[in-house]
Amino acid sequence: MPFKDQLFLASQYLAPHHLVSRLMGRAADCRAPEIKNRMIARFVRRYNVDMSEALVEDPLAYASFNDFFTRALKPDARPLDDEPGAALCPADGAISQIGAIDNGRIFQAKGHSFGLTDLLGGDAERAAPFAGGQFATIYLSPRDYHRVHMPLAGTLREMVHVPGRLFSVNPLTARSVPELFARNERVACLFDTEHGPMALVLVGAMIVASIETVWAGLVTPHKRQVRSVRYDAAARAPIHLDKGAEMGRFKLGSTVIVLFGPKRLRWLDLPSVRGPVRMGETLALPASTAISFPESE
């Protein structure tokens, strides 16, 4: 491994993750024009951000860097595929891994996997409906659209906030940090859908200032303990979201992991799999009609 990579990984273990993220969050919320305009302009240049799809195309018109980062798109920028029964991609990004949940483990990178139960906060009963099911890990790069949408119409059953570290998420840390996604802070949202259980897990990372959902707003840590909120009929008024509807967003972005139960859906064998994807594209079809692809290598 190159020395610069070793140095970067060492810094990941030594850095005060949450302090760095809080400081970045404050800077990203700053509304002083001389500060926020400089941050936005540098970001657009560095990452070659395409503003032509944004509802507000002028990057300096946003009130803060976070407003720019979580910008809305024009109504026709992400048309939803209309294949009956299809599960859609929830976000713009790149599929880093996709496949089956094998013996309660989810593939991370060569030589690394993490536990399904750990990912969902350590509750075996919560994880059981997804055992033997399917997963897709979608990485959102800095230049991507950072709102997360529903792959299927669903009724929210539970939201789980799991505190943790905030390692950077990139190919190097995926190859090198054991159980990366089950160690980083995350918010797991569990839904009931026409194809059975579905979970969307929004994973934080270094400098990810916050994670929001459309029903709870900003999800904040709670005494560094796992916090579960029930939303089913027995607990409070049910929340139903349509297919393609926004369900959450990242302020400075990271990763979304999608989980489905067993024998309901199969991923499409498309050129886009394990590569760039856009929100609204079909990722999976009912098991009887889709074609599976080889296991992750």
From Swiss-Prot:
Q: What is its EC number?
A: 4.1.1.65
Positions of the record's site feature: Cleavage (non-hydrolytic):
G253, S254
Task: Indicate where this protein resides in the cell.
Answer: Cell membrane
Question: Please, which domain of life does this record's source organism belong to?
Answer: Bacteria
Q: Which GO terms describe its cellular component?
A: plasma membrane
Pathway involvement?
Phospholipid metabolism; phosphatidylethanolamine biosynthesis; phosphatidylethanolamine from CDP-diacylglycerol: step 2/2
Residues with the modification Pyruvic acid (Ser), per the entry, are S254
Mention one GO molecular function: phosphatidylserine decarboxylase activity
How does the annotation summarize its subunit structure? Heterodimer of a large membrane-associated beta subunit and a small pyruvoyl-containing alpha subunit.
Which protein, by its recorded name, is this?
Phosphatidylserine decarboxylase proenzyme
Q: Which organism is it from?
A: Bordetella bronchiseptica (strain ATCC BAA-588 / NCTC 13252 / RB50)
